[in-house]
Amino acid sequence: MFTMKKSLLVLFFLGTISLSLCEEERNADEDDGEMTEEEKRGLLSTFKQVGISALQGAAQGLLNTLSCKIAKTC
């Protein structure tokens, strides 16, 4: 009975060590992933702002043209 408890304790100990090593590797990989994700998010927001600015400019030009034609001042 005692030898069975010792072997189970050794297996548990080895499993815990291997699990902690895997978690450390995973955390190291996630740290690298966070940097690229932040960069992607930065690029995405930049493209989004450029797109919004372009749409606002186009909408403003369209509204100016429509108001000119409605008022017949063109």
UniProtKB/Swiss-Prot annotation:
Task: Cite the entry's keywords alphabetically.
Answer: Amphibian defense peptide, Antibiotic, Antimicrobial, Cleavage on pair of basic residues, Cytolysis, Disulfide bond, Fungicide, Hemolysis, Secreted, Signal
Note the pro-peptide positions. 23-39
Signal peptide positions (record): 1-22
Q: Does the keyword Signal apply?
A: yes
S-S bonds: 68-74
Which InterPro entries does the entry mention?
Answer: Antimicrobial_frog_2 (IPR012521), Frog_antimicrobial_propeptide (IPR004275)
GO terms for cellular component: extracellular region
Question: Cross-referenced Pfam families, in alphabetical order?
Answer: Antimicrobial_2 (PF08023), FSAP_sig_propep (PF03032)
Tissue distribution of the protein:
Expressed by the skin glands.
Q: Where in the cell is it found?
A: Secreted
| GO terms of biological process kind | defense response to bacterium; defense response to fungus; killing of cells of another organism
Stated family: Belongs to the frog skin active peptide (FSAP) family. Brevinin subfamily.
> What role does this protein play?
Antimicrobial peptide. Active against a variety of Gram-negative and Gram-positive bacterial strains. Active against fungi. Shows hemolytic activity against human erythrocytes.
- Its name, as the record gives it, is Brevinin-2MT1
Q: Which organism is it from?
A: Amolops mantzorum
